[in-house]
């Protein structure tokens, strides 16, 4: 198998996966569906049923780059029991996985390999960026490390930390499940670039801003 190594441009546009430029393409029967109240309700029920199935059976791809991968695999132990969320079935092939967790440092030489693995995944597919290195390069501000995996992949959920705890990974699964529940994809048997509606999820920092500001008693390191 031949690989082509390409240099990631830190300040360049995401030309391969222009997520922000996606347009929603209407299904040919969409206008007829919305003319009927019954068919409109049926369409909404079908979307909810499909999204419920996708959100409760997320199969991760067994892939890791660095120490964050160890924290990810820890969540599969009996202590955390990630099987409660239907995400315990680790797939060894990207063609059988639903989402990829980029856990670790994305080196420039590894970027085209990660991109190729992402291309081999079938739709619908999602990406979780786990750890400071995957989010922004972390402490490796150097030419050999891509400063954020979102330079060459569309990322759905970011997990901060160096490294994040397994509980943070489980919270990311819940956020991804919530995001999937609000998605709208064409209910068609035709596979193609038909456009996908993704909900604009509020970041956890903004959502908990009022709660953080209201804190008056700061705990010491021994109390945490």
Swiss-Prot record:
This is NADH-quinone oxidoreductase subunit B. The keyword Transmembrane does not apply. One of its GO terms (molecular function) is NADH dehydrogenase (ubiquinone) activity. Keywords: 4Fe-4S, Cell inner membrane, Cell membrane, Iron, Iron-sulfur, Membrane, Metal-binding, NAD, Quinone, Translocase, Transport, Ubiquinone. NDH-1 is composed of 13 different subunits. Subunits NuoB, CD, E, F, and G constitute the peripheral sector of the complex. It catalyses: a quinone + NADH + 5 H(+)(in) = a quinol + NAD(+) + 4 H(+)(out). The gene is nuoB. Gene3D superfamilies: 3.40.50.12280. Its cofactor is [4Fe-4S] cluster. Its main location: membrane. Its EC number is 7.1.1.-. It is a peripheral membrane protein. GO terms for cellular component: plasma membrane; respiratory chain complex I. It is found in: Cell inner membrane. Disulfide bonds: none annotated. One of its GO terms (biological process) is aerobic respiration. Belongs to the complex I 20 kDa subunit family. It comes from the Bacteria. [4Fe-4S] cluster binds at residues 67-68, 133, 162. Binds 1 [4Fe-4S] cluster. NDH-1 shuttles electrons from NADH, via FMN and iron-sulfur (Fe-S) centers, to quinones in the respiratory chain. The immediate electron acceptor for the enzyme in this species is believed to be ubiquinone. Couples the redox reaction to proton translocation (for every two electrons transferred, four hydrogen ions are translocated across the cytoplasmic membrane), and thus conserves the redox energy in a proton gradient.
